[in-house]
Swiss-Prot record:
The lineage of its organism: Eukaryota, Fungi, Dikarya, Ascomycota, Pezizomycotina. This is Mechanosensitive ion channel protein BA. It is an enzyme of class 7 (translocase). The chain crosses the membrane at residues 108-130, 150-175, 196-214, 234-259, 469-489, 503-523. Residues 1-67, 677-943 are annotated as: Disordered.
Length: 943
């Protein structure tokens, strides 16, 4: 049943025609098979699978068109087999390749026999049928005999040159093992040595065979003919040229061997040793956890880099494969089994070869072979590192220690265990984390690859140098050849020298560049392939090294830069890859007022950071901070010295470590805290802006406000809204007897800081209150709810104020017009002093606007301290009148501006408290603190 709340019910939908309701092919649909015998999914499951046959060939394929024909590709050349003109090896080429795969003796017999048989025919004919036949005065058999000797001696000399290195290594290796390296030179000089030996044999056998053969001796014709002398000179010239060629090749090989020994020998040995140690660890890991076990199945598949062994045989979870995959899965399983069986057979043959030769020969299952192959790729290197680390580390630990390696390798291999641990513990902190071992093994593989690339590029540079020297040797050989052939040797030398002198001006720059490049590359050699260098303050990665130039990649933007070696020979080059643990210095500018204690606190914070467990693998525990400058006496320049535990060869690692340290440095500076330069001046400016104004408050008021204040309390303009709304006052309208007005304004309010006394505001004829005197303060009690009644029994002119007791401050009746604080009257301990601003503003008011002074508990004190004086108020009564008539001095309640001032007002007054009824009590006792008897007496008198 559809959901009635579904918003898609009433949406009109357009009907779309289709062949079926589900959109899939009907089972009755017939799809023709491919005529080419291709794979058709529909052919296998034509009736069972719902979508079977959807990938089969279209009907047009049955007609022979619509598709590209298949072409057979040769695996060796990568070219179609039907196009021999594109460089495909012909049958003769395939035969030659088959011959090259034969043994040395068989191959040489194949080389020698055909031509030797052809040369033997004239010899046989001259010895049997044409005995009198001669060539240049030499009988036919002996002439072709010398040619046969020349041809056969070429291959014999080649065999001798091939055997010489082994003989030299066997003989000289017994005397000194260090001389074995020269066997490599002899092996590389096989062709030059062959040419020299061949020329020697040809020259030595020419005259004896041509001139001094037995037939000439019988005939007495032993004189050397002119053409024989010329041939002898030519052979001698060829011998000299062969010697020059041999010398040039020997020089190149000596440069190559000495250079490789100087630059790469130590690195090659270290790389081989590291691979051997990793092989030991991997072999121990395999002994604990066999290959392809459930713990390391994926890692072993990655290490072996085999598609057949990688991944599970089943599909993804929740996905069932169709039956069409069963044959492929069967083939895959067969291939897996065949591959493993083949590996076992190869391993068995390798074990036999190891027993015979003592070396690992074609043993693909050997640990060293697997490690060497795994280090070629980053992914397999990481898998190898994970397998070793996880198999060695005990459960519950987060790092690999030396005792773990010793325990796994067993007794008697403590030296190998320590060497393995030293190789992997690059930071030297005593433990190896998973990230650290991955980084170490990946670095070993990367070093191995860069070393191979460096050797290859240097070999290319040496090859270029070889070609250059070979060109020079060829020029010299031509001169030597000409000198031996012609009679005027001096004339030829003079002509050649003149030619070289004229060409020296043309090739002077090139010769200088070549010589400088050779010195830079083979003598100095400041970098290798893959090194991170800095040239003219720009970081680069070396990509290629040639004889005359080098190619770099910029680290910042990946630009490729080519620089001539003669230019690099004149600049400073910083090589980060060849450096050990590096130090970094950062300069920060701080405030000039920074103290030594703050600098030491900053150093402690940074040392805490570098010594934490997360960072001790990257940085050394020591940090240097020094004051390197003071600028223009406005700042301090601090230099922070940070010691890394590795170099900066890997840019990503260096950038991550530097970013982490910079964030920690900023956090430490904020935590101390250390201010930036100029922070003190900014604080002083902010303090000046926040300083209170010393001028009176009335001076800052607008002129209109000042004029209203100076006019006195008779002309108030602005009501004070700061009074609390909980005070009460009552107004009685004379026109309406019994009517009472309640207004929520108050005449008592606390002043901000001026608590030395309180002032009651005057009641004017206009029944308004002036703002400066609307505020009064009730100390400590906060009593703002006292009702005050205003009546009309006394006129405003003869109005008296009632003194009310407020805790420790006793308020006596006073003249409202004076409003001044008496000198010598101090506040009590529980009152806060008035602020200077308030006091100054009060003193700046006119005399008739000053607030009344605070009153003392005893009236006698006031009479002694303050003599009677004439009030400055315009009212007719004096200060003494208020104390002489306490019963008639009724304190009015202030009112707000909310009531109607146009109505006639009647004020009620509360009678003053009788002092005699409060004997034994201080006159400033609050009625709320009285006893019941005192309260009743007070209420009766008040009413």
């Amino acid at each position: 049943m559809p959901n009635p709340n579904d918003v898609t019910i009433d949406i009109p939908l357009t009907s779309v025609s289709s062949r079926g309701q589900t959109g899939a092919r009907n089972n009755s649909t017939n799809i023709p098979n491919s005529p080419s015998g291709g794979y058709s999914a529909g052919a296998e499951h034509n009736g069972g699978a719902e979508k079977g046959g959807l990938t089969s060939s279209p009907p047009s394929s049955s007609l022979g068109f619509g598709h590209r024909r298949r072409r057979t590709i040769n695996d060796k050349t990568g070219l179609p087999a039907e196009e021999p003109e594109d460089g495909t090896v012909t049958r003769m080429g395939r035969f030659y390749q088959a011959v090259l795969n034969f043994s040395t003796v068989t191959r040489y017999l194949i080389y020698i026999a055909p031509l030797a048989a052809l040369l033997a025919i004239p010899i046989i004919v001259g010895a049997t049928a044409a005995e009198d036949a001669k060539i240049g005065g030499v009988s036919l058999p002996w002439f072709f005999c010398w040619v046969e000797v020349v041809w056969v001696s070429l291959w014999v000399c080649k065999l001798v040159a091939k055997v010489i290195p082994f003989v030299f290594q066997f003989v000289c290796g017994i005397v000194s093992a260090g001389t074995r390296k020269y066997a490599l030179i002899l092996r590389n000089l096989e062709i030059p040595i062959t040419m020299v030996l061949w020329m020697i044999v040809s020259l030595v056998t020419f005259l004896p065979i041509m001139v001094y053969n037995p037939r000439n001796k019988r005939e007495g014709d032993t004189e050397t003919k002119s053409w024989e002398k010329s041939v002898k000179n030519v052979l001698f010239a060829f011998l000299v040229c062969a010697l020059i060629f041999l010398g040039e090749k020997t020089l190149v090989q000596l440069i190559s061997i000495s250079y490789h020994r100087k630059q790469f020998d130590a690195r090659i040995k270290e790389s081989k040793r590291n691979i051997n140690l990793i092989g030991i660890l991997y072999d121990a890991s395999r002994s604990m956890f066999p290959m392809y076990c459930k713990e390391f199945r994926e890692d072993d598949a990655i290490i072996s880099d085999s598609i057949l062994l990688g991944g599970p045989e089943t599909g993804r979870p929740g996905h069932s494969r169709s039956n069409s995959a069963a044959p492929l899965r069967f083939i895959r399983g067969v291939q897996q089994n065949v591959g493993r069986i083949g590996g076992k057979i190869t391993g068995a043959l390798g074990d036999v070869a190891h027993e015979i030769t003592g070396k690992q020969v074609f043993n693909s299952s050997a640990a060293r072979s697997i490690v060497s192959e795994a280090l070629e790729r980053r992914r397999s290197s990481e898998a190898l590192a994970r397998r070793i680390w996880m198999s060695f580390v005990i459960e519950g630990r987060e790092a690999l220690y030396l005792d773990d390696i010793m325990e796994v390798l067993g007794a008697g291999k403590e030296a190998e265990a320590e060497e393995c641990f030293t190789m992997l513990d690059r930071d030297g902190n005593g433990d190896i984390s998973l990230d650290e071992i991955i980084l170490a093994i990946s670095e070993i593989g990367r070093t191995r690859k860069t070393l191979n690339h460096s050797v290859h590029d240097v070999d290319q540079a040496i090859h270029v140098l070889d070609n250059l020297l070979a060109t020079i040797a060829f020029i010299i050989a031509v001169l030597v050849f000409v000198s031996f052939v012609t009679s005027g040797f001096g004339t030829v030398i003079a002509a050649g020298a003149t030619s070289l002198l004229s060409l020296s001006f043309v090739f002077a720059t090139t010769a200088q560049e070549v010589l400088g490049s050779c010195i830079f590359l083979f003598v100095k050699h400041p970098f290798d392939i893959g090194d991170r260098v800095e040239i003219d303050s720009k970081p680069y990665i070396v990509q290629r090294i040639s004889l005359l130039y080098s190619v770099f990649r910029n680290v910042n933007d990946n630009r490729v830069t080519q620089i001539p070696n003669v230019v690099l020979n004149t600049v400073w080059i910083d090589n980060y890859s060849r450096s050990s643990a590096m130090q970094e210095k950062l300069t920060i500018e701080v405030n000039i007022d920074t103290t030594t204690e703050e600098i030491q606190a900053l150093k402690d914070e940074i040392e805490t950071f570098v010594r934490s467990p997360d960072n001790k693998r990257d940085f050394h525990p020591d940090v240097d901070i020094e004051v390197s400058g003071v600028g223009a006496l406005d700042k301090l320049e601090l230099t922070v010295g940070l010691f890394h535990k590795s170099n900066w060869a890997i840019e990503s690692v260096r950038a991550a470590r530097r970013s982490k340290f910079m964030v920690a440095l900023v956090a430490a500076v904020k935590k101390v805290p250390i201010r930036t330069p100029g922070a003190a001046a900014e604080d002083a400016a902010a303090a000046d802006g926040d300083r209170p104004d010393d001028k009176p408050d009335d001076a800052e008021q607008p002129p209109a406000r000042q004029s209203s204040i100076s006019e006195g309390i008779r002309h108030p303009t602005v009501p004070d809204d700061s009074f609390p709304s909980d005070s009460k006052s009552t107004g009685v309208d004379l026109g309406r007897p019994g009517s009472v007005q309640r207004r929520g304004a108050s005449a008592t309010a606390a002043t901000g800081n001026n608590s030395a006394g309180s002032a009651y505001s005057e009641t004017t004829l206009n029944n308004t209150v002036s703002e400066p005197y609307q505020r009064s303060f009730t100390p400590n009690t906060g009593d703002r709810d006292t009702d005050h009644y205003h009546g009309s029994m006394s006129s405003p002119v003869t109005e008296r104020h009632l003194g009310v007791s407020h805790d420790s401050i006793a308020r006596k009746a006073s003249t409202a017009s004076t409003g001044r604080r008496r000198a010598g009257i101090m506040t009590t301990a529980n009152q806060s002093l008035a602020s200077p601003t308030t006091m100054q503003s009060e003193s700046a008011l006119p005399p008739h606007l000053q607030p009344p002074p605070p009153l003392q508990p005893s009236s006698s004190q006031y009479s002694q301290q303050y003599p009677q004086q004439q009030s400055q108020s315009p009212y007719s009564y004096t200060y003494s009148e208020r104390y002489d008539q306490p019963e008639s001095s009724l304190q009015p309640l202030e009112h707000t501006t909310s009531y109607n001032q146009s109505l006639p007002q009647v004020y009620e007054y509360a009678p003053a408290a009788d002092r005699n009824s409060l004997e034994g009590h201080s006159p400033h006792v609050d009625p709320r603190h009285m006893t019941e008897e005192q309260r009743r007496n007070y209420e009766s008198r008040r009413l």
